[in-house]
Structures are given as structure tokens and as C-alpha cells.
From Swiss-Prot:
Assigned keywords, A-Z: Cytoplasm
Coiled coil regions in record: none
Organism: Halalkalibacterium halodurans (strain ATCC BAA-125 / DSM 18197 / FERM 7344 / JCM 9153 / C-125)
Name used for this protein in its record: UPF0298 protein BH2594
Signal sequence range: none
Source species taxonomy: Bacteria, Bacillati, Bacillota, Bacilli, Bacillales
């Protein structure tokens, strides 16, 4: 099975009764009842077209893309601080 890269998006709705309709656009990961938004995952290739389709619906307030694929996860300076390293050896 080939895995494709997915990207998340937060879709803010006017009412949650329309949340079930979003299942045809991707995988619905989470639905917030209090803040009325849906976290939706879809393929990276179809993100722009899906976003345009979602924004055209009358029940969608806003669509925001997740920036997680663009955030750097490898850090340059990964050495621990000398003072903290000494405290760990002491057992504090």
C-alpha cells in the first residue's frame, strides 16, 4: 500500500450539522462542538482544490491550512546546557 502525504486543515462551520458532509473531501480527524470547527486531512496534491470547494459552501466560515509540513523539525543546537547537565548528575 502506497502512503501519500497528507495535510491538515481546520474548517470553521456555522453549524455542526454540516460536519458529516465534509467526509467526502477527506478524513475527518476531530470535530469541536464548542468552537464549531472540523480538522480534516486530505492529500497534498488536492489541498488547493479542496480548499476552494470548501470555501464555496454557505455553511463554511473559514478554512485554514496546517503549517506542520513546513515547520523545521531538525534543530541545529541540540546540546544540553552545562548547568542542567550538572544538576542531572547530582540527582536534583
Amino acid at each position: 500500500m502506497l502512503t501519500s502525504n497528507r495535510q491538515g486543515m481546520a474548517v470553521y462551520l456555522t453549524s455542526l450539522k454540516f460536519a458529516r458532509q465534509l467526509r467526502r473531501f477527506g478524513y475527518v480527524h476531530y470535530v469541536s462542538k464548542k468552537m464549531r470547527y472540523v480538522v480534516l486531512y486530505c492529500n497534498e496534491e488536492a489541498v488547493q482544490t479542496t480548499m476552494e470547494k470548501l470555501q464555496s459552501f454557505h455553511f463554511v466560515k473559514d478554512v485554514q491550512l496546517s503549517m506542520r509540513p513546513y515547520v523545521q523539525t531538525e534543530f541545529q543546537n541540540a546540546k544540553p546546557d552545562k548547568a542542567k547537565e550538572y544538576d542531572y548528575k547530582m540527582g536534583l
